[in-house]
Amino acid sequence: AIAAVITFLILFTIFGNALVILAVLTSRSLRAPQNLFLVSLAAADILVATLIIPFSLANELLGYWYFRRTWCEVYLALDVLFCTSSIVHLCAISLDRYWAVSRALEYNCKRTPRRIKCIILTVWLIAAAISLPPLIYKGDQGPQPHGAPQCKLNQEAWYILSSSLGSFFVPCLIMILVYLRIYLIAKRSHRRGPRAKGGPGEGESRQACPVPGGPSASAKLPTLATPVASASEANGPSKPAGEKEEGETPEDPGTQALPPGWATLPNSGQGQKEGVSGASLEEEAEEEEEEEEEEDEPQAVPVSPASVGSPPLQQPQGSRVLATLRGQVLVGRGVGAMSGQWWRRRAQLSREKRFTFVLAVVIGVFVLCWFPFFFSYSLSAICPQQCRVPHGLF
């Protein structure tokens, strides 16, 4: 019965992890750099199921090590390597989740496939450093029954404690602290609500990863446009620059002239009036990637006394009319675009938190499964006589 259950678990492990690797490598929606962690973790689990569990099952059923001594040493090293790699992978994934939630804009620019591969390589090197001592130093392997060869790990206290700390307890402590920190961040951001720091009410604009040779992120376009002159100015002779009519109120210094090249909007009252239709520099840089944002580009339509007799200008949804000393300016949906960017950012954070919760459940179950082994394994080094664990329970 035990052999049948273990065999089913072996096949299920191989099949399930093979599907994970296949899904990440073939699905375009799963080709994010962070999913390389899942590919490496699944590979480690497949290696455990194919190279470790079958020989462990044979050793338990026979009661002795049937295979050669050389393979016993390699088997012990691979056992520590693959199991430690699986646990440290989960630790690396938890750190990746934490950086993605706490420093999303900055870390998303740095989360490249090259960086993720370097982290994965570091994980395997840590696991290899912990698994090498059984190959280099055989140490005390405990009493060997006559005529029944055994294959056991180094039974010296220093190796038991150091391997337990590096393989389980330290990564487990890191994961607990990291997920506690993620929980506190999620709780604080939920309390702050939509008007919290970074919300649309404070004019936050979404930052993009810096592009070499691109426009400066600090460049800003004017919010208000200088409205056109009255009908008498439009139909009468133009005056030299800087010359004002008698009794005319000086121009509000808060209003800025439109940059050259902005498109004009037609008006039914007179041929065409000057108007503006443009996008911020950041939106222009993102135009190719997010074409749907084009409808959120800010527009400013001047409204002057000359247009009183004309049909009323329809105000676009989400726009607003600002009054100046020389008339009114209809400002388009710049704030709406900003708000849309903020809500997209909120949706991204929500997805990160949901994924983090799922990973926390998986890691919690994984830790609960490993804790009994490492706890009893460590007791054999701390108090080998007084805290002896029954062989069947171990």
Curated annotation (Swiss-Prot):
Residues 191-318 are annotated as: Disordered. GO terms for biological process: platelet activation; regulation of smooth muscle contraction; regulation of vasoconstriction. PROSITE patterns: G_PROTEIN_RECEP_F1_1, G_PROTEIN_RECEP_F1_2. Residues 63-72, 141-156, 383-391 are extracellular. Residues 26-36, 96-117, 181-358 are cytoplasmic. InterPro entries: ADR_fam, ADRA2B_rcpt, GPCR_Rhodpsn, GPCR_Rhodpsn_7TM. Keywords: Cell membrane, Disulfide bond, G-protein coupled receptor, Membrane, Receptor, Transducer, Transmembrane, Transmembrane helix. Residues 299-312 have a biased composition (Low complexity). Disulfide bonds join C72-C151. Alpha-2 adrenergic receptors mediate the catecholamine-induced inhibition of adenylate cyclase through the action of G proteins. This is Alpha-2B adrenergic receptor. It comes from Oryctolagus cuniculus.
